[in-house]
Amino acid sequence: MGIDVLTRLLTRRFLPTIFKREITHATHAGTPLSALLIDVDKFKHINDTWGHNTGDEILRKVAGAFYNNVRSCGYVFRYGGDEF
């Protein structure tokens, strides 16, 4: 339940715990903290037009791009569907 089978990212199950910990750390350390919620636009159209296998491949590629471009101390979650 903690790792998304399709994208191999953390699932939203861990988001509250990790986010709370990072907010506490940033507050105590006096360092900035950034969070993004990203939704893939028109994703239903992709699934409807090219099929779910293509949609799954796009989700894997998007997840990989996010994961590979986040600092080593950062986290990437698949919140659900096409939201990261």
Where are these regions (language model features)?
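Amphipathic HAMP/coiled-coil signal-transducing linker helices
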Residues: M1-L10, T24
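Hydrophobic/aromatic micro-motifs used in signal-transmission helices and low-complexity FG repeats
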Residues: L6-T7, V40-K42, W50, F84
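Conserved long alpha-helical elements within nucleotide-processing catalytic cores of c-di-GMP signaling
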Residues: T11-S34, K44-Y67, F77-G81
